[in-house]
Every structure is written in structure tokens, then in C-alpha cells.
């Protein structure tokens, strides 16, 4: 799958260079003009995306945790507060670069807490035909963790590729599918891959409101865990100005399984997150 993603990325990048002139004339009359559409890239301008959220995590086997406080040597049954700021610059209207800074404060009930800082740089490009929209992107995230009761989590690097394709499936309805691939390196010699497949609908019931609803299936290759999650996604935006939108997004893990052995072993079913964000274009 990694080779397929890489080949697709290079092929679509070459095609996009030929398609950009055609896009410029049609962009104002397509769903791409909707700044909340997942394919939207601002034309020769900036977009700021500010997010703050709360989440309940049932299992993250890649995070080391004190055994006395969790019952396992990894993170279980915790809640977190997250905040991030992402700045995107649209270079041509179909190609953009972006960078973000994020902070995550995580605490297990009745136990101590730890925090994490993230830095991300990336790029994305749209390849557009008459009916289908296609976006490819790549980014790298570096994460730094504080100690948790003398338990250390190594700094990690997450290299991410994605491919997204969508088309209008009805009046005011835009359907899309997304494939994500991550390869995560941490510690001196530890590494695992993760994959996500998402199917969703972007709905525009009015000129000022939009909504997204979908499902995501994800799995990883982390040794000893190999988690598999099915997650329900729901979100909505209200455009308060032509260049500003307020959003509320939520997700909930409907089903989860893994290869962790033992009676009553944990999984991620029932995990959820709720996030508020503001998009501002300038």
C-alpha cells in the first residue's frame, strides 16, 4: 500500500501542473469556493485554523505509562485537552503549504498528567477534473513528551501521506473518500505504520451552514497491539462572514479490537472527542 500511495502522489502531481489553468476559470462556481469544503485551498492568501478540544481516550498503546496507575505499561482510560494553530498559505489556488503548532494535556482519572508539544510542516495540491476532485498531501510532525511519573516517552516523528477524492453526489451534497498513511518513528529503533480509510459527505443545506458526516476505519502495525477502530464522524460549520467560519466537530469510536492478550484487556471502543474551531481567511 505504501508503494501505491507514493506512485499515486507523483502521478497526480504531474497531472495537476497541467490542470491548474483550467481550474482558475471554474473555481468560483464549484464547491471548492466553500472554505469549509475539505478540498478548499485559498488562492494566493492565508487561512488560519484555530482549534480547541476535549477527548476521552480508552487506549493508546504507543504511549508509555506507569503500570501502577494504568494496570498496563501503556496509556488507558485517560482524558485530554488539546489546542492547535494551523497557518496555510495558498500559492496558486490549487497548491498550498502549511505549518502548525499543537499542545496536548493528558490525564488519567486519579493519576498524574503529562503534556505533549507537536510541530508540523506540510504541503497539499488539488488535481481537478470536470466531475471529480482529487487532493494529495504530505506532512511531517515532530512530537515532544514530558515525563509521567518517571516514565519517559521518546520524541517521535510522524511522516504522513494522504490521498482524497470526491464528487458531487446530489444537490448540495459532495461525497468524498480519503486514504491516510502514517509511518511513526520513536525511540532509538521503534517504528510502526498506521492506515485510515474515510468515507464522508459534505452537505451544504444553506449558503451559511455546512455539515460533514462519515465513517473512518483505521488500523496499525504496532507490535503487541495492532489496534483496529471504526469511528463515526460528525461536524458542522456556520459562516459568520465571507472569510470566517465557526465549526464544531465530534467523533466516537463505535467498535475496536486489538491483539493485546489477557482477561479484560483494554480496547478503544467508546473513545470520543469534541472540538471547536475557527477558520479565518486573509
Stretch-by-stretch model annotation:
Residues 10-17:
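Hydrophobic h-region of N-terminal signal peptides that target proteins for export
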Residues 19-59, 202-209:
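Outer-membrane beta-barrel biogenesis signature
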Residues 54-83, 107-113, 256-264:
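Surface-exposed strand-loop-strand hairpins of Gram-negative outer-membrane beta-barrel proteins
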Residues 46, 59, 93-99, 129-136, ...:
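Repeated loop/turn-to-beta-strand initiation elements of outer-membrane beta-barrel proteins
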Residues 238, 252, 268-282:
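Outer-membrane beta-barrel "beta-signal"
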Residues 38, 49, 86, 122-124, ...:
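Outer-membrane beta-barrel architecture
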Residues 50-56, 99-103, 136-142, 177-181, ...:
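Transmembrane beta-barrel strands of outer-membrane/channel proteins
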Residues 97-193, 199:
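Outer-membrane pore/translocation modules
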Amino acid at each position: 500500500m505504501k508503494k501505491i500511495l507514493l506512485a499515486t502522489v507523483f502521478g497526480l502531481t504531474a497531472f495537476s501542473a497541467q490542470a491548474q489553468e483550467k481550474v482558475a476559470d471554474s473555481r468560483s462556481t464549484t464547491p471548492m469556493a466553500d472554505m469549509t469544503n475539505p478540498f478548499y485551498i485559498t488562492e494566493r492568501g492565508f487561512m488560519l485554523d484555530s482549534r480547541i478540544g476535549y477527548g476521552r481516550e480508552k487506549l493508546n498503546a504507543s504511549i508509555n505509562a506507569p503500570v501502577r496507575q494504568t494496570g498496563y505499561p501503556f496509556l488507558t482510560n485517560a482524558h485530554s485537552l488539546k489546542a492547535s494553530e494551523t497557518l496555510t498559505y495558498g500559492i496558486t489556488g490549487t497548491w498550498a503549504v502549511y505549518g502548525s503548532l499543537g499542545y496536548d494535556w493528558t490525564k488519567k482519572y486519579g493519576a498524574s498528567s503529562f503534556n505533549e508539544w507537536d510541530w508540523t510542516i506540510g504541503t497539499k495540491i488539488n488535481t481537478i477534473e470536470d466531475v471529480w476532485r482529487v487532493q494529495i498531501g504530505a506532512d511531517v510532525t515532530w512530537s515532544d513528551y514530558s515525563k509521567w511519573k518517571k516514565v519517559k516517552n521518546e520524541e517521535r516523528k510522524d511522516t504522513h501521506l494522504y490521498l482524497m477524492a470526491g464528487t458531487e453526489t446530489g444537490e448540495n451534497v459532495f461525497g468524498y473518500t480519503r486514504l491516510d498513511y502514517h509511518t511513526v518513528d520513536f525511540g532509538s529503533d521503534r517504528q510502526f505504520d498506521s492506515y485510515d480509510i474515510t468515507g464522508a459527505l459534505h452537505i451544504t443545506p444553506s449558503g451559511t451552514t455546512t455539515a460533514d458526516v462519515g465513517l473512518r476505519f483505521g488500523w496499525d502495525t504496532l507490535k503487541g497491539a495492532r489496534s483496529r477502530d471504526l469511528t463515526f464522524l460528525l461536524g458542522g460549520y456556520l459562516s459568520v462572514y465571507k472569510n470566517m467560519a465557526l465549526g464544531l466537530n465530534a467523533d466516537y469510536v463505535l467498535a475496536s479490537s486489538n491483539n493485546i492478550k489477557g482477561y479484560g484487556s483494554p480496547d478503544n471502543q467508546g473513545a470520543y472527542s469534541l472540538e471547536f474551531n475557527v477558520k479565518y481567511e486573509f
